[in-house]
């Protein structure tokens, strides 16, 4: 938590250094428990009239190339790892996360592997060995070919097949709940989780 609070202030400073106006107090007023995310920053800066002509933000305004999901696209473009407003945070390892999920009665599933594997499907083998029990084969981020590929991988590894749209409300306005490419009755997937 302390890391996230410190990172919030650093992200705001880094966005300012990029030449984008941001009211830190307004960002903090939108933040749950004081944690400012890249999406919150995007919402604040894109609604600030002083940024209306900022060339860095033009792609996120209506009609822009990144306007389909402006808040999360801003995050990916400026606040994700390797980007100008990225701030490193130490998280628990995947192995620890999987163990914690299992210990608390959950089912560890690899979400949107088409993105999370970053084009390196060979990583799946090591992730399976860490103990995941399922894979989100159906994802709004996947093409039909990727859906089929991850279904095949799930079957080969004996993993549960899940699906998700990655709906996040206003953060991803072009992503709709339940829209993730499942071409069959999803009850078999649901029943497998019981």
Language-model regions, residue ranges each:
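Extended substrate/RNA-proximal surfaces in nucleic-acid metabolism proteins
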Residues: 1-117, 121, 187
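Charged catalytic cores and adjacent phosphate/nucleic-acid-binding surfaces used
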Residues: 91-106, 110, 114-194
């Amino acid at each position: 938590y302390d890391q996230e609070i410190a990172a919030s202030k650093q992200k705001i400073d880094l966005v300012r250094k990029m030449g984008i106006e941001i009211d830190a107090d307004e960002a903090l007023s939108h933040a749950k428990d004081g944690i400012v995310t890249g999406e919150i920053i995007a919402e604040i800066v894109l609604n600030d009239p002083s940024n209306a002509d900022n060339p860095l933000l033009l792609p996120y305004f209506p009609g822009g190339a990144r306007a389909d999901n402006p808040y999360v696209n801003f995050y990916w473009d400026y606040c994700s790892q390797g980007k100008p407003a990225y701030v490193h945070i130490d998280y628990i390892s995947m192995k620890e996360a999987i163990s914690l999920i299992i210990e608390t009665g959950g089912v560890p599933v690899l979400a949107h592997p088409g993105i999370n594997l970053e084009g390196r499907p060979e990583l799946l083998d090591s992730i399976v060995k860490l103990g995941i029990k399922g894979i989100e084969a159906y994802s709004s981020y996947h093409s039909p070919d990727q859906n089929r590929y991850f279904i095949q991988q799930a079957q080969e590894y004996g993993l549960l097949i899940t699906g998700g749209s990655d709906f996040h409300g206003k953060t991803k306005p072009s992503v709709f709940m339940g829209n993730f490419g499942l071409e069959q009755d999803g009850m078999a997937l649901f029943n497998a989780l019981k």
